Amino acid sequence: MPSHHTLLETETLASSKLADAKIDVAAMHAVSSIHRAANASRNHMTNTVLRPHELSWTGFVVLWSVWIYGEPETREVAESAGISKATLSGVVKTLSARGCLKRTQSSSDKRFAHLSLTPAGMTLMEELFPQFNSGEQQLVADLTPDELTVLTKALRKVVTTAEGLGAHTSV
């Protein structure tokens, strides 16, 4: 559900509220826009693509991580999804009960476990991801190819900077 204030209204209100503060308004607007775009994108994808498949955003990200990385350790999936290992445990339980995911104890170290997609999980991802990508295309449809390239490069720099500041550590 979108905010009842537009992005410009929010930025204008924040700038006037903080007019006397020594802040970097451009940085505030940029990071605020990243958050707002991420939330709007996540809500759109959840409502239009994932909900019909009875998947949460977190459930999808866990399935996607396992699909992409093969048979990763649970701690790698938790980090990739940006969730705690405790949260991952609940998500794995739900996805396993649906028959999409399998958890296997490491044979070399019992403290670790690996996740893998079941045949049903593989089928789900192979059917779902093209729909997900269509949603991604909708979200960037108003950008020119050059704008899309510039946006992607700029966001990758922000991610790299955030990770360098320690943002990639476990939740």
PLM segments and residue spans:
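Short, locally clustered residues in the helix-turn-helix/winged-helix DNA-binding domain
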Residues: 35, 39, 64-68, 129, ...
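Alpha-helical residues within the helix-turn-helix
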Residues: 51, 79, 96-97
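C-terminal regulatory/oligomerization modules of transcriptional regulators
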Residues: 1-22, 149-171
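N-terminal leader segment of winged-helix/HTH proteins
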Residues: 1-53
